[in-house]
Amino acid sequence: MLHVLSVGPSHAAFTVEAAMATMKKFHSIVGEKPAQDAEAPSVDDPNVGQIRADDKEAAHAPANAETNNEEANPSDGAQAGVKKIEAVTLSWTRGTAIWFLTLVNDFRLSMYTSLNAYATSSFLGHSLLTVINIVSYVMGGSVYIPMAKALDLWGRAEGFLLMTFFCILGLILLASSQNLPTYCAGQVFYKVGFGGLSYTWNVLAADVTNLRNRGLAFAFTSSPALISAFAGSKAASDLLAHSTWRWGFGMWAIILPVVALPIYGLLAYHLRQAEKKGVLVKETRDWSITPKTVWWAIMEFDLPGVLLFAGGFVIFLLPFTLAATAPHGYQTDYIIAMITLGLALIIAFGFYEMLVAPVPFLNYKFLIDRTVLGACLLDMTYQVSYYCYASYLPSFLQVVYELDVATAGYVTNTFSVVSFVFLFFAGWLIRWTGRFKWILWVCVPLYIFGLGLMIHFRQPGGYIGYIVMCEIFFSVAGSVFILCVQLAVLASVDHQHVAAVLALLFVMGSIGGSIGSAICGAIWTSTFLSRLERNLPASAMPDLSLIYSSLPTQLSYPVGSATRTAIVEAYGYAQARMLIAGTAFMVLGFIWVGMMRNLNVKNMTQTKGNVV
């Protein structure tokens, strides 16, 4: 175990050094935009969105002005969190900007992907993977809008620290859980925390980069995945062999504060520097806990809307996964009650937001912009499609293709490795052309093509190389989706609304992930179990429930035995139907891309200070 734990820091150090060196080269090529040389937007561009044109018109100044007092100070009228990050970027140096943009950690995600199936199996909950995903994704999605308001009102540093706390709490619960409900609760805090960190990181990336360079910035923040995708899978394998899956979560409760607190310190330090330089005037606000401030917080963060949103989607989606194992299927009384109540809560959420909420959960100004709406729907559709088949992929590779944990992790993490290369390539194309919509027209059919091939190849007896080939197709298209939908929503708003519009995008993605997990769970429970019942030999029937609920039990049967062959056949039958569902949903992507305007981000600017 000591050997395994020593893997992380060495790889992390190498990753940071390599990423910093790469970013230095990036700066030497791209250059750093001085505070006084902000790029001017193209006022003649007919594709400029209505939201952006209305909000940014007064903020734009000529690029060739010798002095620009507006660029020297944060935006007037901006919220406190926006003013703080603009002040930070106006005061920090090139070295800290490089350091900040390269400090990323993907190691824990690689380990989590490999360990999750074993953790749930220890509670006989392997078949409930999608149930846990539904709850955690919906709860994670419900915090993005309040998180956006917190980032704008309080600051990026404070939001980052809060999400770090949730991460650590979730990791502790996961590592110490003794039953499935505790593990599920840990998953909720884990997804809320790391989802919030990811969201905060994306907001910070938007804060310190211009739109034309944002693709390159995202590519460089993905560079550590070249190391963590392999090292994380290997570390997870060694933990399972020599220790326990619990250390795969527990170690991060120790490591994460060491990695995260310097980022908070960096932001807080430069905020103080900005205050000393007079770039930011410190604002005072009474945060004492009184009935008035509590009521203000409830309304400002729309907690009733959050509860209706989270409760409605969780209660509505769970029955589709649970129905197959209910006594009377969809005719079971509690299944009917959950679907009815969940749908009622979702409808109530819509009416509450339109008619009652003083500060709505969703900003309807964004939803009437066709580019923002198209990008959000494309992201949601992509997440639905992906999670239709992804939840049981690591288990499938180990049971059907007889891969060990590390090798299965390498295949599963193909996305992380390939995305860096193609994000960099797509980033350069966007920087050169200023356009991104045409790239989406290429990637949507590529993703569907990969899914179609996977329906054929992801079957028992196939060649693993074809699986990897299809994963590469997914990775190329999927990574570009993530980049382009972010560019689309960011290009449609000004800096004041960056956090809010990214929150909307993340919410739609979380809804898509939860819907995809519900579809995956419904297919799994209605096909995998029935095929086991049909094909298992009589000698294995007493262990049907254990086989269905535990990955180690499935792997315990020798390859070629009648029981293992029945399990393999059931996996292939279920996976094909999951992929068919994912392919069918992704066809909607053509409609959503068609909705988006062909924006040119080459001459747009949103940010101030030492940005790239």
UniProtKB/Swiss-Prot annotation:
Protein name: MFS siderochrome iron transporter B
Pfam families named in the record: MFS_1
Gene Ontology MF, one: transmembrane transporter activity
Phenotype for W245A: Decreases the uptake of triacetylfusarinine C (TAFC)
Spans traversing the lipid bilayer: 87-104, 128-148, 157-177, 188-208, 216-236, 247-267, 303-323, 335-355, 371-393, 410-430, 436-456, 464-484, 499-519, 576-596
Primary location group: other
Localization: Cell tip; Cytoplasmic vesicle membrane; Cell membrane
Effect on the protein of changing W247A: Decreases the uptake of triacetylfusarinine C (TAFC)
InterPro entries: MFS (IPR011701), MFS_trans_sf (IPR036259)
GO cellular component, as recorded: cell tip; cytoplasmic vesicle membrane; plasma membrane
Any GO BP: transmembrane transport
Organism: Aspergillus fumigatus (strain ATCC MYA-4609 / CBS 101355 / FGSC A1100 / Af293) (Neosartorya fumigata)
Topology Cytoplasmic: residue spans: 1-86, 149-156, 209-215, 268-302, 356-370, 431-435, 485-498, 597-612
The keyword Transmembrane appears for this protein: yes
Inducing stimuli: Expression is repressed by iron.
Region of interest (Disordered), ranges: 55-78
Bias (Low complexity) ranges: 60-72
Extracellular compartment residues: 105-127, 178-187, 237-246, 324-334, 394-409, 457-463, 520-575
Main function: Major facilitator transporter involved in triacetylfusarinine C (TAFC) uptake. Can also transport ferricrocin and coprogen, but not ferrichrysin. MirB plays a crucial role for virulence in a murine model of pulmonary aspergillosis, indicating that TAFC-mediated iron uptake plays a dominant role during infection.
Deleted gene: phenotype: Impairs TAFC-mediated iron uptake.
Topological type in the membrane: Multi-pass membrane protein
Key words of the record: Cell membrane, Cytoplasmic vesicle, Ion transport, Iron, Iron transport, Membrane, Transmembrane, Transmembrane helix, Transport, Virulence
Taxonomic superkingdom: Eukaryota
Family: Belongs to the major facilitator superfamily.
